[in-house]
Amino acid sequence: MTVIKELNFGPQHPAAHGVLRLIMQLDGETVERLDPHIGFLHRGTEKLIEHKTYLQALPYFDRLDYVSPMAQEHAYSLCVEKLLGITVPPRAQYLRVIFVEITRILNHLLNVTTHALDVGAMNPLFWMFEEREKMLSFYEKASGARFHAAYIRPGGLAADIPDGLDEEIMSFLESFTHKLDDVADVLTDNPIFKQRLVDIGKVSKREAVALGFSGPVLRASGVPWDLRKSQPYEVYESLDFAIPVGSCGDSYDRYLVRMAEMYESVKIIKQCIDKLPEGPVVVDDRKVAPPSRAEMKTSMEALIHHFKLYSEGYHVPEGETYFAVESPKGEFGVYIVSDGTNKPYRCRIRAPGFVHLQALDTLSRKHLLADVPAILGSLDIVFGEVDR
């Protein structure tokens, strides 16, 4: 006779990568059912945004998926710009793509190395945290903050990059690919690593689409869907890069896709730096973008624009729109309803991690208890965006 026992996993558990609580039903060590309990990190973000101006709402997006903040700022900024009917200057577009791809590498490095740590490989984490620190210093030099940058804003960027930062990023990338090769050497053909991930948490193409997957989790199942190619935004259309795709849809394929994406991100950043044009990084519209400090010292009108922008904000035309970007975790979308005032009437956030977490039960059934952290790590879930 089968005896089903219930086991609590989390919400404080080192393999949960956040405040995840799972109610697991086990037959011996085999998972029969898995029920995720969410909401431990709920902060009412969508409601808070309704009480802020469009500029004040921006920092909330940094705090959703706090591992890849600029990707979410990007989605929000593009959504607001679509409502305003403005296009940012070419230099701002190239710089946005550079920092969004740095964000993608930061995210994948953390996921790949902590995932390896979950299954027993410790070294890659220490090697790659040094590389992440260097990339966070690029964030800091551009925006003044290592994590919550608020750098990509509706209308452009907070500021231009300091002189020489583009060359610094380029020289870093030359050495970074060698470090990435070291991680691949340790993990990719490692028999223990493969034993823990191959055929674990398999999803077919049809199932992946039906479950609403996106990003590396979808592409690992063999679906070549990437918003940077299928619905290009900013300057992605003019860049040459491949879309890494898996074949089996298991945890090992998800690891391989993320590793390949980091190499592609390096290619994208190099192309953007080579093509980086001169020019402004904000739109020439003082209702949306602030005037320069120099201009404010000589023009009363510029000073008034600055005061109005940071006290009242700008009024966005009435309407509604949805904009999605290819964030490191998948399709991150922002839906905004504007009533013509300076604050969003409604802001709905589509977080890829929320969709992927729903599939954890399907992926884990009939696997062993020890396989659950391996599957969870392969989905790359951060609870800031899940709970919102």
UniProtKB/Swiss-Prot annotation:
The molecular function terms of the Gene Ontology recorded here are: NAD binding; NADH:ubiquinone reductase (non-electrogenic) activity; quinone binding
Q: Which GO terms describe its cellular component?
A: plasma membrane
Which domain of life does the protein's organism represent?
A: Bacteria
Enzyme Commission numbers on file: 7.1.1.-
Cite the entry's keywords alphabetically.
Answer: Cell inner membrane, Cell membrane, Membrane, NAD, Quinone, Translocase, Transport, Ubiquinone
Q: Give the matching SUPFAM superfamilies.
A: HydB/Nqo4-like
- For this entry, the protein name equals NADH-quinone oxidoreductase subunit D
This enzyme catalyses: a quinone + NADH + 5 H(+)(in) = a quinol + NAD(+) + 4 H(+)(out)
Q: EC top class, in one word?
A: translocase
Function according to Swiss-Prot or TrEMBL:
NDH-1 shuttles electrons from NADH, via FMN and iron-sulfur (Fe-S) centers, to quinones in the respiratory chain. The immediate electron acceptor for the enzyme in this species is believed to be ubiquinone. Couples the redox reaction to proton translocation (for every two electrons transferred, four hydrogen ions are translocated across the cytoplasmic membrane), and thus conserves the redox energy in a proton gradient.
Q: How does it sit in the membrane?
A: Peripheral membrane protein
Q: Name one Pfam family in it.
A: Complex1_49kDa
Q: Where in the cell is it found?
A: Cell inner membrane
Classification via Gene3D superfamilies: Cytochrome-c3 Hydrogenase, chain B
Say which family it is in: Belongs to the complex I 49 kDa subunit family.
Q: How does it assemble?
A: NDH-1 is composed of 14 different subunits. Subunits NuoB, C, D, E, F, and G constitute the peripheral sector of the complex.
The UniProt entry, under InterPro entries, shows: NADH_Q_OxRdtase_suD, NADH_UbQ_OxRdtase_49kDa_CS, NDH1_su_D/H, NiFe-Hase_large
**Primary location class:** membrane
